[in-house]
């Protein structure tokens, strides 16, 4: 098995992979002040919870948008697993043709998302990742990444609303029962949800209008589970791990 690690701005998600199948996942909060030993102990705990051991892990691959944390993770894997992990970045074969102004600016996580969507579902496909930011990336039928969009994630919007107002509280991000909110908490939850949902639906529609072609829409990321609207064809919470497994296979 291989260990796939997605280091994001808000969370680190660790996946135990058997080929392209995700055996188990483990989500922890991203903290730049954790030592490599602390991350190593978390990895061992995850393996134990997955009824696995370090001996079961043959290799590892990392996708990271937080360089400081990535370096700690690399050290932890070398020390606790005896593995120097593969890093998604320059020089790595992905099978994807990045046809954007600055290919190096495309985050490793988004590249893995696109690889996962294209290898699993084919193209053309619009990949939506709902995390700290909500991102959209369009992949054509030949596997070329042609366009990307970045906007505020719903969790980030909720945190900004609470921190920049005197009396509005922090609220849990959830799908509201109704848009007819009768108190402040429900009003915030419904407002945040439907504002974000409306943005997602309009953005998908705009892609269809400008591209004038049919394509699949695949959503992933921590918040995708609450936004399974009719315009989204597939919600795949392990999409990035499928992409990381695909990239790994091209480089061994």
Swiss-Prot record:
Q: Where is the active site?
A: 109
Reaction catalysed by this enzyme: (R)-pantothenate + ATP = (R)-4'-phosphopantothenate + ADP + H(+)
As recorded in UniProt, its EC number(s) are 2.7.1.33
Query: What subcellular locations does the record give?
Result: Cytoplasm
Q: How does it assemble?
A: Homodimer.
Q: Where does ATP bind?
A: 6-13, 132
Check the record and name the CDD domains matching this protein.
ASKHA_NBD_PanK-III
What is this protein's function? Catalyzes the phosphorylation of pantothenate (Pan), the first step in CoA biosynthesis.
Enumerate the UniProt keywords alphabetically.
ATP-binding, Coenzyme A biosynthesis, Cytoplasm, Kinase, Metal-binding, Nucleotide-binding, Potassium, Transferase
Family as reported in the entry's similarity comment: Belongs to the type III pantothenate kinase family.
Metal-binding as a keyword of this entry, yes or no, is yes
This protein is called what?
Answer: Type III pantothenate kinase
Provide GO CC annotations from the record.
cytoplasm
What cofactor does this protein call for?
A: NH4(+); K(+)
- Principal localisation: cytoplasm
What does the entry list as the binding residues for K(+)? Answer: 129
The annotated pathway is: Cofactor biosynthesis; coenzyme A biosynthesis; CoA from (R)-pantothenate: step 1/5
Single Gene Ontology BP annotation: coenzyme A biosynthetic process
Q: Which residues bind substrate?
A: 107-110, 184
Q: How is the cofactor bound?
A: A monovalent cation. Ammonium or potassium.
């Amino acid at each position: 098995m291989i260990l796939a690690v997605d280091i994001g701005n808000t969370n680190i998600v660790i996946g135990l992979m058997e080929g392209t199948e995700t055996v188990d996942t483990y989500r922890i909060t991203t903290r730049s002040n954790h030592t490599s030993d602390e991350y190593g102990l978390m990895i061992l705990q995850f393996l134990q919870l997955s009824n696995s051991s370090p001996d079961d892990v043959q290799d590892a691959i990392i996708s990271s948008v937080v360089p400081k944390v990535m370096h700690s993770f690399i050290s932890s894997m070398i020390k606790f697993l005896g593995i120097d992990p593969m890093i998604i970045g320059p020089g790595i074969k992905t099978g994807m043709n990045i046809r954007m102004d600055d290919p190096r600016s495309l985050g490793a996580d988004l590249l893995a998302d696109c690889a996962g969507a294209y290898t699993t579902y084919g193209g053309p496909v619009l990949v939506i990742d709902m995390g700290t930011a909500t991102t959209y990336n369009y992949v054509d039928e030949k596997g070329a990444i042609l366009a990307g969009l970045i906007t505020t994630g719903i969790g980030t919007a909720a945190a900004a609303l609470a921190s920049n107002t005197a009396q509005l509280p922090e609220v849990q991000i959830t799908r509201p029962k109704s848009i007819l909110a009768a108190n402040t908490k429900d009003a915030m939850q419904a407002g945040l949800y439907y504002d974000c949902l409306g943005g997602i639906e309009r953005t998908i529609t705009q892609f269809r209008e400008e591209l004038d072609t049919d394509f699949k829409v695949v959503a992933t990321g921590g918040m995708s589970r609450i936004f399974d609207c009719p315009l989204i064809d597939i919600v795949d919470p392990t999409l990035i791990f499928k992409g990381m497994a695909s990239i790994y296979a091209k480089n061994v």
